Regions:
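Conserved AMP-binding/adenylation subdomain of ANL enzymes
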Residues: 140-159, 167-253, 262, 287
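Conserved C-terminal "lid"/linker of ANL adenylate-forming enzymes
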Residues: 389, 414-425, 452-493
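Adenylate-forming
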Residues: 344, 378-407, 434-444, 460-466, ...
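Conserved AMP-binding/adenylate-forming
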Residues: 1-28, 163
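Short hydrophobic alpha-helices that are characteristic scaffold elements of the AMP-binding
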Residues: 11-17, 39, 177-181, 221, ...
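Conserved pre-ATP/AMP-binding loop-to-beta segment of ANL
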Residues: 86-121, 128, 153-159
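Conserved ATP-binding/catalytic segment of the ANL
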Residues: 317, 324, 331-332, 336-391
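Structural core segment of the AMP-binding/adenylate-forming
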Residues: 16-93, 422
């Protein structure tokens, strides 16, 4: 189900009971839900209002019961114990705690850090979902990190807006578990995070820190800030000695106000921030920073406070973790990011072969991401190994870098670079609001995209130039962290 206080209660109740949590992302299809429930051998399924009307319990033969999250009613029970417990819940609670539930009844077991806490099934961009086994030590390692890097900058009791899905590790750990343990007041966003909806929520909640994925921040900046801040007049004023500083400060405060006016920093993760947006925010002195991680590390691998942030990077190695780049010259030649430490998973549930493929004999987890690292230890992601393409002369092409440039061009909302034979083609979903506002027809749009292609190719080495831009009428399908599901489009025409 979607984020809610009841989802949070079910999560915490499961952990404190001593059972294993299996979060299911609300974007998953019913078939994916059945596969996860059956593969994980789950005994109890909590469902939100949307999922409740679409699932068929017969497809999950080993489940013992289904609980409706909005009111915790039992939709289906297959055991007498569950039926009795729900019907006599108050009576059983009163019998166990005759003088009410008090502080001394709370007991935390801290002697089993290797015990399994969660199995989190990846959404992935390959279409194959694996169950990531995360022990309690991995949750603690990330919590301890967040207490250290964020806790010292915000006050307990301050407000935080929960935008990201809690079924995803980034949203769960960084936007819920940390804030809950630190004593923040969490407001769950229950609607789709459009720029308007998010801006309204920011204005009401005034969060002490903003935690987001790039797409949300990029849309807010492009829709709410760029129309006034990127005019020729303002750009000229920003470059003028003396007055330029004041103009930048005013724009920075405007951006801060759009995000509630109270945030220590804006922490972005899940993918790289568009370079145009990042450069703009850094130019005006806005407190933006990036982190990097994976489901398999629950999730953090690198992070830096905005005061230590380097443009284009995703931070330095976090505490409790060793991180390195497998390259003979990591400052200049990209290599795979590998890491080890207490954040790393046990492995993939019921999939030893997949586990052995990513965790080597020395305990290093191979992320599948390519990066360089500067002399100060800041990491710069180049792309995924599996996404890397070969250019016309056999050179490596990193599609994410081309997409980042293309996404800043006229009428482009999002893009995907694919290979067709020995040629590179861009699939582009246009910014339809902007197209409609300008009154452009299909022919106009094609002409604009052709100009974009020529302008982009002028910036690219010859082996990574685009042969064509094809217009995609609908938004690309995405994972929970808003990464495009590339596998769906590799062979699409």
């Amino acid at each position: 189900g979607r984020n809610s206080s009841h989802w949070a209660v079910a999560f915490l109740a499961t952990l404190t009971y001593g059972a294993v949590v299996v979060p299911i992302q609300h974007e998953f299809t019913t078939d994916q839900v059945y596969n996860i429930v059956n593969h994980s051998e789950s005994k109890l399924l909590f469902v939100g209002d949307v999922v409740a009307t679409s699932i068929d319990s017969k497809e999950m033969p080993n489940i013992e019961g289904i609980v409706y999250l909005p009111d915790f009613s039992v939709m289906e029970s297959r055991t007498e114990a569950l039926t009795y417990a729900r019907e006599h819940l108050n009576e059983m609670f009163g019998h166990k705690y005759p003088k009410y539930f008090r502080k001394e009844h709370v007991k935390y077991h801290v002697d089993s850090p290797e015990e399994l806490a969660m199995i989190n099934y990846t959404s992935g961009t390959t279409g194959f979902s694996k169950g990531v086994m995360l022990p309690y030590r991995a949750l603690w390692g990330n919590l301890d990190l967040m207490m250290d890097v964020i806790g010292k900058h915000i006050k307990p009791g301050s407000n935080v807006l929960g935008i990201l899905p809690m079924a995803h590790m980034y949203g769960l750990l960084v936007e819920f578990i940390f804030e809950f343990c630190y004593g923040n007041h969490i407001f769950f966003l229950t609607r789709l995070p459009s720029p308007t909806v998010v801006a309204e929520a920011f204005a009401e909640v005034k969060p002490a820190i903003v935690i987001s994925v790039p797409m949300i921040i990029e849309k807010i900046i492009r829709k709410s800030i760029f129309p006034t801040a990127q005019t020729p007049k303002v750009k000229l004023l920003m470059k003028m000695p003396g007055i330029g500083k004041k103009v930048k400060e005013k724009i920075c405060q405007h951006v801060m106000d759009v995000m509630g006016g109270n945030a220590y920093e804006v922490m972005v993760g899940g993918a790289g921030l568009n370079k145009e947006v990042e450069d703009f925010l850094l130019e005006i002195g806005f407190p933006i920073t990036m982190g990097y991680g994976t489901t398999e590390t629950a999730p953090m691998i690198t992070f830096s406070d905005y005061k230590d942030f380097v443009a284009g990077s995703c931070g330095t190695a976090v505490k409790h973790m060793e991180v390195k780049v497998l390259s003979d010259d990591p400052q200049n030649i990209p290599g795979e990011i590998v890491c080890r430490g207490i954040n790393v998973m046990h492995g993939y549930y019921k999939n030893q072969a997949a586990t052995d493929a990513v965790i080597d004999k020395d305990g290093w987890f191979h992320t599948g991401d390519l990066a360089t690292m500067n002399e100060d230890g800041h990491f710069f992601i180049r792309g995924r190994i599996k996404n890397m393409l070969l250019g016309s002369n056999g050179q490596n092409v990193y599609p994410e870098e081309i997409e980042d440039k293309l996404n800043s061009m006229s009428m482009v909302s999002e893009s995907l670079i694919v290979q067709r034979g020995d040629k590179l083609v861009a699939l582009v979903h246009p910014d339809q609001d902007e197209v409609d506002a300008m009154g452009f027809d299909k022919e106009d749009l094609q002409n604009i995209m052709e100009q974009n292609r020529q302008d982009l190719n002028a910036m690219l080495p010859h082996f990574s130039k685009l042969s064509e831009i094809r217009i995609q009428d609908y938004e690309f399908e995405k994972t929970a962290k808003k990464s495009i599901k590339r596998y769906l489009y590799q062979n699409a025409e």
